[in-house]
C-alpha cells in the first residue's frame, strides 16, 4: 500500500516526508515530497494528490513539483506574516478536526502564541460538547493566550479552563472569553 515515513515538520514552512508504494511514469515508487503548508495532516492530502498524479501518468518530478507549489485557498491554513506577527488563518467552515489541526500547527510556532477562536456552526446536537472538547485539546498545547468570541466559543474557553484546572502540568494558557464580539475587537484592535 501507499504510506509515508521520514515525516519531518518544517514548522510553519510545511512538512517533508518520503512516500512509498505508488508507481510513477518514470518508474519511481519511493521519493521525497515537501508540502509547503504546515501541519502533519497535510501529509495525507499530499499523498492522495501524489496517488492521483501517478494514476494520471505523471512522473515523480512532476508530482514533486505539483506538491511543492501547493497554494491554499482563502481561510484554509493560510500563513500571513505582517508587522512582526504571524497569523494562521483557518477560519473557513471550521469544524473540530480542522480546529484541532490548526492548534497543532500553532503549537509548533516559535514565540508567543495567541489563539483567537470563534464558534463553529452546523455541528448538530452535540455542538456544545464539541466546542468544549476543542478547549480541552487546546489545554494540552503550548499556547499562551486564548481569546474566544461567541456563545458556542465560550465552551472552548470553558474546556481550556477545565483542563488547566485539573492538570498540574498544563502550560497555563491565559483565557479571555468575549461576548459580544465587539468587546473582543476593542481588546485586540
Predicted regions and their residues:
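Extended acidic/charged loop-beta regions that coordinate divalent cations
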Residues: 1-30, 73-74
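ATP-dependent carboxylate-amine ligase
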Residues: 23-28, 38-41, 47-189
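Beta-strand/loop nucleic-acid-binding surfaces
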Residues: 33-36
Amino acid at each position: 500500500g501507499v504510506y509515508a515515513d521520514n515525516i519531518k515538520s518544517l514548522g510553519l514552512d510545511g512538512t517533508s516526508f518520503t512516500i512509498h508504494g505508488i508507481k510513477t511514469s518514470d518508474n519511481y515508487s519511493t521519493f521525497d515530497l515537501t508540502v509547503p503548508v504546515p501541519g502533519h495532516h497535510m501529509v495525507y492530502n499530499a499523498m492522495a494528490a501524489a496517488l492521483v498524479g501517478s494514476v494520471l501518468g505523471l512522473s515523480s518530478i512532476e508530482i514533486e513539483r505539483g506538491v511543492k507549489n501547493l497554494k491554499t485557498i482563502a481561510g484554509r491554513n493560510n500563513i500571513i506574516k505582517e508587522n512582526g506577527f504571524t497569523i494562521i488563518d483557518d477560519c473557513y467552515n471550521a469544524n473540530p478536526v480542522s480546529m484541532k489541526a490548526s492548534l497543532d500547527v500553532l503549537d509548533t510556532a516559535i514565540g508567543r502564541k495567541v489563539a483567537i477562536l470563534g464558534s463553529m456552526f452546523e455541528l448538530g446536537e452535540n455542538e456544545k460538547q464539541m466546542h468544549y472538547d476543542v478547549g480541552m485539546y487546546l489545554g494540552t498545547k503550548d499556547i499562551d493566550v486564548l481569546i474566544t468570541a461567541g456563545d458556542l466559543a465560550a465552551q472552548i474557553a470553558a474546556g481550556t479552563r477545565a483542563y488547566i484546572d485539573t492538570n498540574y502540568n498544563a502550560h497555563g494558557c491565559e483565557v479571555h472569553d468575549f461576548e459580544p464580539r465587539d468587546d473582543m475587537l476593542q481588546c485586540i484592535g
